[in-house]
Amino acid sequence: MDLVTLDATQHASYPEYCSLLFQGKASKQLSFEQIANHLGRSEVAVAALFYGHARASQEDVEKLCELLGIPPADLSKRLRGFPDRGKGVDMPPKDPLIYRLYEIVQNYGQAYKAVMNEKFGDGIMSAIAFSTKVDKELDDQGNAWAVITMKGKWLPFTRF
């Protein structure tokens, strides 16, 4: 199994605890899916914790420390703090996969907005009251397809 790791020299803007999490993940040879199952959370939510883009509950911290063999004192206060979301990603992104996601919004953002406005009215899709997941599908020829599902609460603009 190929596992994602973190090269802290290339990602100096991430919080220090990110390296601890990734070191524990690598030493235990665990995927985000396996860690997510242990925490009872989604893979994407767990990956966001590892990059410092999400806040962990005390239960998350305890389970992570137990699973990854990290002393709780090293993580508890830092991982329970308020995250600095969005830090560490250049705009436009340089990583090819992240750039493709950016490109999807560039190419289809107006179309998504138009269809959503017609279906829901004037407003926005929340990225706070939000969930997302990634699935893998194989077509009839055996080609792998990435399926990204995003679900956000609709927030209508208010008149004032």
Swiss-Prot record:
Catalytic activity reported: cyanate + hydrogencarbonate + 3 H(+) = NH4(+) + 2 CO2
Keyword Cytoplasm (UniProt): no
Source organism, top-level taxon: Eukaryota
Protein name according to UniProt: Cyanate hydratase
Keyword Translocase: no
Encoding gene (name): CYN1
EC number(s) given by UniProt: 4.2.1.104
Biological function: Catalyzes the reaction of cyanate with bicarbonate to produce ammonia and carbon dioxide.
Keywords associated with the record: Lyase
